[in-house]
């Protein structure tokens, strides 16, 4: 994925994203996966995770005389049981742990404020806080430091030589990444200082392997047409690959006089970056990995930071477990999981998405509400993708569009409960906003669901007619049919307080979605396709982006996958550029949009992390939600 930026990109794929389409279907549903029982694994014998198109005959209760042939995806039941989820407990609750955390927080604050503003140590400390997942505690301090750094080095002084670290690749690349991450448009030309007279990066830079790794990570903050950053990506990739090859040679290790711990740490970090760059990773997963695999082994490990990071992770995890238990009780009470055995019951996986979107302890309401949406999107997606007839799907779409609970009697029996739960859930969310802000947002929320269901319906029509869409047609529909737009629209109202007329004008909900939402949704769609398209085609579904590209260009599957990865990289460049028309959108909301893309890449990195319930999915859920980090007493 790291090499994708060297390709040419067709701007029509992103720039022609539609105003609210009247199409249908979704793959956002593949967001969710396992299920476990008290053990924690259910004692019920698991079925194969492969989805097969199975024909089954079902009598339509609405029309007793008619027999309908329906498809089945043969989804596994959930492995995470209600009883197991309710049994989750942790010791990391209560005032004693909070007092301990606050004491450590004061010590870390003193560290931050005690370092000289232009020191490399200060940059490294900020980077370490981020990778340990605790930088959110010091948001104001970090923002103040970086603002002063940017002002001193790039506003008041236009000459790079005034930067004391100007000839240090590691320091400059780290500073560039941190400043761009926080919204400062540091010029890419800063890296020209590391080029020779021919305009090529100096070969001696490869001796600074951590500097090259920082350069590689910095290149992912590129925007469109930033050619210097494209060059840094190519150069750093080549250097890192050569280093990895050298480290496989025992003689080279002796020549370089590196100890095994240093080599292993470097190789771990490089492999980790090649899998996904830091900019594309979710905070919570990165924190657990960095704590477990890297930080304790570092020679300059700070015991205060380490203790603070582990304790904070466990305290926040205890809040996540409470949120999950609340969600589990809601899911049990609405009884959808047991009534619709053709659909995926993916409660735990839905919650994992929410942890990726907003993990901080203070956002419990956001997680509890938004996780319901993930669950409902999965269920409704399976109705459209697998079970419903075209006539039934048109009825359901019309009912959502008219938003009248009286229409429930016009629906087939199996659709009544999903429609009723959807109607009640969205109205409940609207009521919460009305109480808190005296603002009626039901029309906005409803519209996002209407858009989604129309997209589902259009994809169903494609399927039943055997239509082969072009890649452009598919992406114009697919960025909406993935369902992420529904999540983000609801997230906006959860995270924005107060809601102003200027905010609503920026959203332009009556016409189209903001670019930041479109971009996040497109990455989510493409990541989903990379992870799930084979299984979906096996069970009977419309062609995905991979197959559309193969059809359009007479390409192989490998070539198509490379192109989809390239589109993801190009869309990230669009998302890296702040749209002035969206400047009034809150920082929290913009970050959640980016986190949607990051979480999709995390979920689908190694296949269908939402629906397959494989060992990797179970391990991720366990480490992030269930199992605390060991803290010796």
From Swiss-Prot:
Source organism of this protein record: Cannabis sativa (Hemp)
Residues engaged in binding Mg(2+) 1: 381, 385
Residues where (2E)-geranyl diphosphate binds: 344, 381, 385, 525, 528
Localization: Plastid, Chloroplast
The keyword Magnesium appears for this protein: yes
Family statement: Belongs to the terpene synthase family. Tpsb subfamily.
EC code(s) of this entry: 4.2.3.15
Name of the encoding gene: TPS15CT
GO biological process: diterpenoid biosynthetic process
Protein residues bound to Mg(2+) 2: 381, 385
Protein name per UniProt: Beta-myrcene synthase TPS15CT
Record carries keyword Magnesium: yes
Main location class: plastid
């Amino acid at each position: 994925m790291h090499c994708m930026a060297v390709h040419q990109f067709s701007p029509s794929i992103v720039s022609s994203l539609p105003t609210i389409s009247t199409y249908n279907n979704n793959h956002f549903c593949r967001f969710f996966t396992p299920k476990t029982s008290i053990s924690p694994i259910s004692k019920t014998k698991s079925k194969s995770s492969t989805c097969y198109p199975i024909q089954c005959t079902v009598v339509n209760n609405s029309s007793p005389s008619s027999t309908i042939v329906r498809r089945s995806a043969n989804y596994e039941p959930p492995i995470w049981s209600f009883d197991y989820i309710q049994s989750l407990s942790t010791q990391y609750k209560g005032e004693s742990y909070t007092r301990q955390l606050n004491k450590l927080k004061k010590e870390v604050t003193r560290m931050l404020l005690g370092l000289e503003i232009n020191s490399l140590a200060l940059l490294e400390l900020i980077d370490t806080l981020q990778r340990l997942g605790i930088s959110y505690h010091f948001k104001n301090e970090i923002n103040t430091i970086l603002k002063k750094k940017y002002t001193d080095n790039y506003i008041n002084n236009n000459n790079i030589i005034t930067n004391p670290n100007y000839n240090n690749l590691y320091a400059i690349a780290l500073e560039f990444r941190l400043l761009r991450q926080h919204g400062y448009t540091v010029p890419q030309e800063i890296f020209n200082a590391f080029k020779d007279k021919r305009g090529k990066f100096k070969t001696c830079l490869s001796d600074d392997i951590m500097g090259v790794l920082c350069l590689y990570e910095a290149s992912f903050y590129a925007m469109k047409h930033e050619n210097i950053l494209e060059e840094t990506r190519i150069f750093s990739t080549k250097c890192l690959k050569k280093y990895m090859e050298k480290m496989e040679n025992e003689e080279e290790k002796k020549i370089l006089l590196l100890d095994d711990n240093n080599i292993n740490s470097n190789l771990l970090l490089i492999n980790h970056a090649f899998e996904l760059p830091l900019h594309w990773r979710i905070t919570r997963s990165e924190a657990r990995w960095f704590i477990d695999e890297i930080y304790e082994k570092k020679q300059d490990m700070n015991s205060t930071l380490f203790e603070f990071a582990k304790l904070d992770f466990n305290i926040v995890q205890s809040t996540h477990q409470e949120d999950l238990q609340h969600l589990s009780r809601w899911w049990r009470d609405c009884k959808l999981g047991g009534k619709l055995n053709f659909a995926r019951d993916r409660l735990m996986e839905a919650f994992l998405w929410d942890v990726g979107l907003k993990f901080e302890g203070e956002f419990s309401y956001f997680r509890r509400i938004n996780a319901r949406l993930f669950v409902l999107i999965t269920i409704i997606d399976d109705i459209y993708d697998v079970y419903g007839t075209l006539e039934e799907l048109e009825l359901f779409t019309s009912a959502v569009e008219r938003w009248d609970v009286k229409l429930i009697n016009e629906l087939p029996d199996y659709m009544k409960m999903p429609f009723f739960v959807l109607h009640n859930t969205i109205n409940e969310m609207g009521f919460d906003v009305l109480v808190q802000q005296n603002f009626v947002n039901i029309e906005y929320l409803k519209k996002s669901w209407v858009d989604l269901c129309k997209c589902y319906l259009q994809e169903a029509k494609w399927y039943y007619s055997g239509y082969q869409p072009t890649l452009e047609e598919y992406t114009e529909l697919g960025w909406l049919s993935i369902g992420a737009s529904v999540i983000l629209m609801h997230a906006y109202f959860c995270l924005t307080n107060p809601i102003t007329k200027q905010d609503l004008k920026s959203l332009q909900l009556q016409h189209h979605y903001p670019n930041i939402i479109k971009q996040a949704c497109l990455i989510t769609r493409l990541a989903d396709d990379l992870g799930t398209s084979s299984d979906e085609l096996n069970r009977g579904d419309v062609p995905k982006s991979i197959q559309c590209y193969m059809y359009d260009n007479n390409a192989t599957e490998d070539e198509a996958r490379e192109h989809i990865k390239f589109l993801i990289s190009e869309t990230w460049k669009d998302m890296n550029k702040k749209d002035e028309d969206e400047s009034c959108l809150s920082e929290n909301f913009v970050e959640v949009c980016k986190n949607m893309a990051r979480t999709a890449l995390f979920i689908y990195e190694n296949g269908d992390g939402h629906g397959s319930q494989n060992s990797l999915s179970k391990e991720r859920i366990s480490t992030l939600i269930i199992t605390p980090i060991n803290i010796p007493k």
